[in-house]
Regions:
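Bacterial N-terminal signal peptides that target proteins for export
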Residues: 1-8
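Extended, charge-rich low-complexity interaction segments
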Residues: 353-371, 464-485
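Flexible, low-complexity junctional segments that flank or bridge functional domains
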Residues: 24-351, 407-409, 422, 436-461, ...
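Flexible, glycine-rich surface segments
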Residues: 370-432, 436, 446-447
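C-terminal segment of classical bacterial N-terminal signal peptides
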Residues: 14-22
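Low-complexity, serine/threonine/proline-enriched polar segments
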Residues: 328-383
Length: 504
């Protein structure tokens, strides 16, 4: 069976990222920043929304996807909305949030947008408190302690200006982030409910009702600039782990392996750290296989290349076990054969060759380039790379010994997406137990590149290929067998919770 690699966003978005960095480095240090220069923001939105639309038409595999007839109408409807908003856009906030809404309308974590000016952010306002999701409820999790006019910690939001809490979150957050049906999105962005960042397409609420200790009270909101420590406050609420790559061995014989990224960019520090981690795992292979438990920590891992999770599986379970317990085969991968996509993979291949990249990745890139070029020359929309069909009389793989003496736990949080999801798919098929929190999710559109929009102020993420016959469906998260409540950044508490899951 052919194994389809995902080289990942971090690898393949190089060309545009390098171009953007070069532009920033060429500018004099005291030159005005692009986002601060006066401009016609209405015309800029029209230009960039049209450019976004045209890039998608040219290169996104969904445009001609017979299994997704809603894609093209959604693309056109999003442009119509953005162009209508351009008629009344007067500032950078109107431009940015209209484009964010257009991108969010695709309901795809692999379609994204970012501002090219490094570290740019819009000034924010708040009413003196923030809410986050706790299950289905939005509760006050941070407030100015000196402001008696704000709801108490733990108070549950009921509604604002007559709009129910969940509908309000969909309007204020989901409209601009997308995939609001996912628990991970609400976990990651729920604190935006009571933040205002120069978004003219939503207003600032005037009054809200909260329930605390069985009593409901109405609060008038006093919006003002956020305090200087707002980012630290939000980081504390997010409970996101700041993990490093590494392999820890505990006194009870257990192991903890942390992989906060699968970035496969040949020039990245992450590549060196992943390479060193795999080498360390190979050195300790016998001890890992004899351990009472091994924790594969994926907290904070937003993806990269699926190559690394395959290597880790080989070290732990071995090739024979993986062959005897295969994932459901993907039928095929279809690449959108466009000039832009061919150029992106060609740039990636050049970088791989220049850095003596892994032969498997080089062969993968060469195959994709040659296939897309042939399809493009023949006037075909896609180049199809089909999986090898098993003969009807093919014998099943022979039984293989289970080399892992103890349990393998895969620890996930809401950040897990793309190649991180591929890792969860693979490791659970091999026998790992998922613990922690529900992951994010992706669609079957994969392998992004990041072209810059016409204004030069933003760049978008555009998938280049589509999976056919993937077992995990569109926007389907991985849900843990064992949910671990509490702070997902508390390593000691997580280890204690996992140890309690161990069989007696």
């Amino acid at each position: 069976m052919k194994r389809f690699l995902t080289a990942g966003a971090a690898c393949l978005a190089m060309a545009s990222a390098v171009h953007t960095q070069a532009l920033a480095q060429d500018a004099p240090a005291d030159a005005p920043k692009p986002m601060d220069l006066p401009r016609d923001w209405s015309a800029t939105l029209t230009q960039d929304a049209t450019g976004l639309h045209d890039i998608m038409i040219d290169s996104h595999p969904g445009v001609h996807d017979p299994l997704n007839p809603a894609f093209k109408p959604r693309l056109e409807e999003g442009l119509t909305v953005a162009l209508e908003r351009a008629k009344t856009t007067t500032d950078a906030g109107g431009w940015w949030w209209a484009l964010r809404a257009y991108v969010a309308s695709f309901e795809d974590g692999h379609v994204g947008i970012s501002i090219t000016q490094p570290n740019y952010g819009f000034p924010t306002r708040w009413p003196g408190f923030l809410t986050v999701y706790r299950g289905a409820d939005q509760v006050v999790a941070d407030r100015e302690p000196a402001d008696a006019a704000t709801p108490p910690l733990g108070a549950r939001l009921i509604d604002c200006d007559g709009v129910a809490a969940e509908a309000l979150a969909e309007q204020r957050i989901g409209q601009f982030r997308g995939r609001w049906f996912l628990e991970a999105q609400r976990t990651l962005y729920g604190d935006w409910q009571f933040l205002s960042a120069q978004n003219p397409w939503i207003g600032e609420m005037r009054q809200c009702r909260f329930e605390a200790d069985g009593a409901t009270k109405t609060y008038a909101l006093n919006w003002r600039a956020t305090p200087e420590d707002i980012y630290a406050r939000r980081a504390k609420l997010a409970q996101r782990a700041a993990t490093d790559f590494g392999l820890k061995h505990f006194d009870d014989g257990g192991f903890w392996i942390s992989t906060p990224s699968f970035n496969g960019d040949p020039s990245s520090e992450t590549l060196a750290e992943l390479t060193a981690l795999i080498a360390d795992m190979k050195t300790k292979q016998d001890a890992l296989r004899a351990a009472p438990y091994v924790v594969l920590d994926l907290r904070g891992n937003g993806g990269g290349s699926s190559h690394w999770s395959q290597l880790m599986a080989q070290v732990l379970w071995g090739d024979a076990w993986m062959a005897a317990h295969p994932e459901p085969a993907i039928e095929a991968v279809e690449w959108r054969a466009s000039d832009g996509n061919i150029a992106e993979i060609s740039a990636f291949l050049d970088k791989l060759r220049a850095t003596n990249g892994q032969p498997e990745l080089i062969a993968w890139a060469e195959d994709a380039i040659n296939g897309m070029k042939a399809a493009h020359a023949a006037g075909q929309v896609y180049w199809r790379s089909a999986n090898d069909e098993k003969p009807a009389d093919a014998a099943p793989p022979p039984p293989a010994p289970q080399l892992m003496a103890g349990r393998v736990y895969v620890l996930t949080d809401s950040s897990c997406g793309s190649a991180c999801l591929d890792a969860v798919d693979l490791w659970k098929t091999a026998g790992a137990l998922q613990v922690g929190r529900e992951t994010s999710a992706d669609t079957v559109y994969m392998e992004i590149r990041e072209p810059v929009l016409p204004s030069g102020l933003a760049q978008i993420a555009v998938p280049m290929k589509v999976y056919r016959g993937r077992a995990r469906g569109n926007n389907e998260p991985q849900r843990p067998q064992y949910i671990i409540a509490g702070d997902m950044s508390d390593d000691a508490a997580l280890l204690a919770a996992i140890r309690r899951l161990q069989p007696d």
